[in-house]
């Protein structure tokens, strides 16, 4: 697998659209929004797109991915943790219906009366419905006693079966796995930081900040202990995992990294990191978050170190603008910008004829 790094989302979309012309689709891996983890109305769509890409990487399917530098700077869980929490169900195997809901919830799935959207599951009387993030349709697992009797995809509207399969692999609906040991581990780390920061606010007579922090911590405790989930869990990543990774760790060293306009990437990375750091500092001082929540983004110098472990190709309109890397070879290409034809087929034909006559 190869990775294209771009300065912004518009550039990423251009790569995806252009890839259709060449027959091989470039897959977009969106950034998590570290400044607004709890306010992202597109959260499920982002989580699903990211998990689809991660599945492709885990399955070792060759492909090309594109990411903004913001997305590359997001800290992520070790890839091994996602691999270890895939679930595979096979015909004839046994399944504990009593505990399956707990397993799904730990992997980020939401219990519902009926499955209607990706990320939901339902359990009732020997029937388990689940809509994996990595599938186009929900699946129904029917039990005979505690043995899997059938596995089939179905239409969520009509409930009619689409296809029967012998096995089904389900990827998590969240990159952070919240099983009971990890919940306890995360809470211990949070309580430790909470006590220190709470005492600091009290000592400095910052009672509003202390009350705000206490309210947030109460919410976190309640959601984790009662619901076994946490809204905005990505913002608490360092509390649940001692060692986080950069998404570049997901790509083998033989992967090629393409940098589209390195100067613009550097400018965006520096601006993003500054914006993130200032926002986190302000929120920390205001009692809106815990200290380690400010450590969910990797600085650009560390990203460069990771990039240099791979083979690399940089594209820049001005060659003098590549300063972050030692250039081993330079290739110059003559290109021309073209006008927008606005559905004027006649003008397109004229221009093509003119270009052909010059050859």
PLM segments and residue spans:
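ASCE RecA-like P-loop NTPase motor cores
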Residues: 1-359
């Amino acid at each position: 697998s190869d990775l294209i790094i771009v300065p912004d989302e518009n550039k990423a979309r251009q790569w995806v659209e252009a890839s259709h012309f060449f027959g091989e689709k470039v897959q977009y891996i969106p950034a998590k929004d570290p400044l607004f983890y709890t306010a992202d109305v597109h959260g499920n769509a982002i989580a699903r797109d990211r998990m689809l890409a991660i599945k492709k990487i885990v399955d070792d399917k060759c492909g090309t991915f594109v990411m903004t530098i913001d997305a590359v700077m997001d800290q992520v869980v070790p890839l091994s943790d996602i691999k270890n929490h895939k679930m595979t169900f096979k015909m004839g195997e046994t399944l504990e219906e009593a505990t399956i809901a707990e397993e799904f919830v730990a992997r980020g799935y939401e219990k519902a009366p009926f499955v209607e959207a990706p990320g939901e599951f339902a359990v009732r009387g020997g029937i388990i419905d689940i809509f994996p993030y990595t599938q186009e349709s929900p699946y129904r697992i029917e039990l005979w006693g505690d043995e899997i009797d059938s596995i089939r995809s179905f239409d969520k509207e009509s409930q009619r079966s689409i296809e029967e399969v012998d096995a089904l692999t389900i990827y998590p609906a969240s990159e952070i796995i919240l099983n009971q040991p990890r919940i306890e581990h995360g809470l211990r780390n949070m309580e430790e930081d909470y006590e220190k920061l709470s005492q600091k606010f009290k000592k400095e007579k910052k009672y509003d900040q202390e009350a705000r922090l206490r309210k947030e911590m109460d919410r976190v405790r309640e959601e984790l202990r009662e619901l076994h989930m946490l809204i905005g869990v990505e913002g608490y990543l360092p509390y649940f995992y001692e060692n986080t990774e950069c998404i570049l760790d997901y790509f083998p060293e033989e992967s090629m990294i393409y940098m589209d306009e390195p100067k613009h990437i550097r400018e965006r990375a520096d601006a993003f990191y500054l914006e993130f750091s200032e926002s986190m500092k302000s929120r920390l001082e205001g009692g809106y978050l815990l200290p380690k929540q400010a450590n969910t983004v990797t600085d650009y110098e560390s990203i460069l170190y990771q990039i240099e472990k791979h083979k690399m190709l940089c594209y820049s309109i001005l060659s003098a603008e590549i300063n972050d890397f030692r250039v081993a070879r330079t290739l110059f290409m003559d290109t021309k910008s073209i006008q927008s034809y606005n559905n004027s087929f006649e003008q397109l034909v004229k221009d093509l004829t003119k270009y052909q006559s010059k050859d």
